[in-house]
Curated annotation (Swiss-Prot):
UniProt-recorded name of the protein: tRNA 5-methylaminomethyl-2-thiouridine biosynthesis bifunctional protein MnmC
Family note: In the N-terminal section; belongs to the methyltransferase superfamily. tRNA (mnm(5)s(2)U34)-methyltransferase family.
Taxonomic lineage: Bacteria, Pseudomonadati, Pseudomonadota, Gammaproteobacteria, Pseudomonadales
Entry keywords, A to Z: Cytoplasm, FAD, Flavoprotein, Methyltransferase, Multifunctional enzyme, Oxidoreductase, S-adenosyl-L-methionine, Transferase, tRNA processing
Organism of derivation: Pseudomonas putida (strain ATCC 47054 / DSM 6125 / CFBP 8728 / NCIMB 11950 / KT2440)
One Gene Ontology cellular component annotation held by this UniProt entry: cytoplasm
Signal sequence range: none
Gene responsible for this protein: mnmC
Record localization: Cytoplasm
EC number(s) on file: 2.1.1.61, 1.5.-.-
GO process terms (BP): methylation; tRNA wobble uridine modification
Length: 654
């Protein structure tokens, strides 16, 4: 999957319209753009009627080729507001190869002041838009936008969704022949179902014939303005073939929209918020006296992207998760709860410098770029041993603030001092027990207690491990406040928050004791010396008594492949029996439904990346539960799936 972002190259004509240099065409007609959208895409698909008929909590999914300036999205959102039930939802999925940068997007959408109620919320969240899947939430989750940034023929095959309405847009076939291909139409068919409708402005004969061959019944209809005719259609072809059963969608839970989430850290609060935004009543059971008391409780966590130049599943998830988290943080108070101060990763040896050079060549400079020592020092505000890789959109977060913000939804009920020891399934309801006390029950449960999920029998075989980490809190001084960005080497140090710098973090694979130790404080101070001797002097580290230093320790929870474990849970024994043939031939795909433990999900194993991966994983869990488009590429969702470990055991004969 390509990693390099290519923004749209825009010129502006004398009427103020954006013009694409790449396609040598305007994005929309000067006086008729909105009316064309309403006629071709909203009218021909009878979208107002569809919205009006939506039941409470039902969701219409619109798919689009070519997001461009977002006009079709804004018009669809406006129509949804006008006609849909207040509890209905809209999920808009759009592919864009060359996204507009923020300045161009702002200039374009302000041509439509009548749509400001819809364009301004997008502009507020239009940050960290990088290649791959980028999800946005609006109006408390009632409207979701998933942008697929990249080539349509690379992105759509990775989409796991059922589309109800297609907006077949993008520049005209003559201007954009690489998009209008049989491969595209085959993907439209794969993602459609009987009843899916389609609107498009083009009436080109070969496009119509190709859509018919793909399974759409197409017809020409009167156009508008200079477009004499346009086309509309409906999918009448067969359903797509099933995927591998171990990654198939579980049946959507019917009945009351009630869920339990066990654990109120980042993974738990994110899962609860994502479900609550979809109309679920969520009870969160937390064993401590408040949320974010374990690994999510550090005063400052770093928004740091440890990427690969090769587009691995982990790298793709980090890019998508980083964008999603950054957009969620816009709702918090900057300076107190988080800060986009940037993150500088020092090139502390030749191997690291080589790695950074490869990353800088693979990614957009807006995401990361190399700095020489003088440039790095100018940004950091302190003397450094060398240059490094700078992430201008990164920064630090106070994780408890993010957890608390997510738990404030009126559909969430947090119950503290409740330690769940056992789960039982009785009459399609999961019951949470503590000894002989029934704590709560619901048809859906999300286990989000880091490595503590292993105490529950359905998760006992998940290969999670705990790694102890300790941070040190250093009182800021007048001169240490010069530090303006997070700086990392083997450890990290953040600019001050409420009068303290956070310094960390140790890695201990053996200790089970959470009491902070003097030895690890000393180890963290040694990490600070590697980052900046100047900053250590500004903090008067030599005068500090390690015995008096404050800090906290917690357990990171990680998996062997460093990807989180997110998704539905299957019965381990029945799974091994159903797919035992894989031990003899890994190419087999038995026609046996996966033995899901209906309504049971997990969100764990985020390691030291929880700020980046846990919030989007909450959306992934909710998409599984509700049968919505997944917010990550299929291959990435499968790489995070709990069943991956059962498959590996079968194939390896263990």
């Amino acid at each position: 999957m390509p990693t390099l972002l290519q923004h749209a190259q825009i010129d502006w004509d004398d009427q103020g319209r954006p013009h694409s240099r790449h396609y040598d065409d305007v994005y929309f007609a000067v006086n008729e753009g909105i009316e064309e959208t309403k006629h071709v895409f909203l009218g021909q698909t009878r979208l107002a009627e569809r919205f009006a008929n939506l039941a409470p909590h039902a969701c219409t999914v619109i798919g689009e080729t070519g997001f461009g300036t977002g006009m079709n999205f804004f018009c669809a959102w406006q129509l949804f507001d006008q006609h849909a039930h207040s509890d209905a939802r809209l999920h808009f999925v759009s592919v864009e190869k060359y996204p507009l940068d923020h300045a161009d997007m702002a200039r374009a959408v302000r041509l439509w002041p009548e749509l400001a109620a819809y364009t301004e919320p997008l502009l507020e969240q239009y940050v960290a838009v990088h290649p791959g899947f980028q999800q946005f939430t609006f109006t408390g989750g009632r409207v979701t936008l998933t942008l697929l940034i990249g080539d349509v023929l690379e992105q759509l095959p990775q989409l796991d969704a059922q589309i109800d309405v297609w907006f077949l847009d993008g520049f005209a076939p003559a201007k954009n022949p690489d998009m209008w291909t049989p491969e595209l139409f085959a993907q439209l068919a794969r993602l459609s179902h009987p009843g899916t409708v389609l609107g498009t402005f083009t009436t080109t004969g070969w496009v119509r014939r190709s859509l018919v061959e793909a399974g759409f019944a197409m017809k020409k209809v009167p156009g508008i303005g200079k477009k004499w005719e346009v086309m509309s259609g409906a999918y009448v072809g067969p359903l797509p073939g099933p995927c591998a059963p171990w990654y198939a969608r579980p049946a959507v839970t019917q009945g009351p929209r009630e869920a339990l989430v066990i654990g109120a850290g980042l993974a738990g609060s994110s899962s609860a918020a994502s479900l609550a935004r979809r109309g679920w009543q969520v009870t969160v059971l937390e064993r401590h006296e408040a949320p974010a008391q374990e690994a999510s409780g550090n005063p400052q966590g770093v928004l740091y992207l440890k990427l690969s130049a090769h587009g691995t599943a982990l790298s793709q998830m980090i890019l998508s998760g980083f964008g999603y988290t950054r957009r969620q943080l816009q709702r918090l108070q900057r300076g107190r709860d988080w800060d986009a101060c940037g993150v500088l990763q020092l090139a502390f040896d030749s191997k690291e410098a080589e790695r950074q050079g490869k990353l800088a060549a693979a990614f957009d400079p807006g995401l990361l770029h190399c700095l020489a020592r003088a440039e790095a020092e100018a940004i950091a505000g302190v003397a450094l041993p060398g240059g490094g890789l700078f992430y201008p959109e990164g920064g630090w977060v106070h994780p408890p603030a993010l957890c608390q913000q997510q738990l404030q939804h009126p559909g969430i009920h947090l119950v503290t001092h409740q330690e769940v020891l056992e789960l039982r399934k009785v009459d399609e309801q999961w019951q949470a027990w503590a000894g002989d006390q029934l704590l709560a029950r619901a048809p859906v449960v999300v286990l989000a207690g880091a490595a503590d999920v292993l105490r529950f029998e359905p998760c006992a075989q998940l290969p999670l491990k705990r790694i102890r980490g300790q941070i040190t809190r250093l009182p800021a001084t007048v001169s240490s406040q010069a530090l303006r960005t997070v700086v990392c080497a083997e450890g990290y140090v953040a600019p001050p928050r409420e009068g303290e710098h956070t310094l960390g973090a140790s890695f201990d694979f053996h200790s089970e004791d959470l009491a902070p130790t003097v030895a690890e404080h000393q180890g963290n101070l040694a990490l600070l010396d590697e980052i900046s001797v100047d900053l250590a002097q500004r903090l008067a580290v030599a005068e500090l008594d390690p015995e008096q230093l404050q800090g906290r320790a917690a357990f990171r929870c990680t998996s062997p492949d460093y990807l989180p474990i997110v998704g539905p849970i299957a019965d381990a024994q029945a799974f091994a029996e159903a797919y035992a043939v894989l031990g003899r031939d890994a190419r087999q795909v038995p026609d046996v439904p996966c033995p899901w433990l209906g309504g049971l999900y997990v969100n764990s194993g985020h390691g030291s990346r929880g700020l980046i991966t846990a919030p989007l994983s909450g959306e992934l869990v909710a998409a599984w539960v509700c049968g919505e488009p997944l917010p990550l590429p299929r291959a990435v969702a499968q790489a995070c799936h709990p069943n991956r470990f059962g498959l590996r055991r079968l194939i390896r004969g263990k």
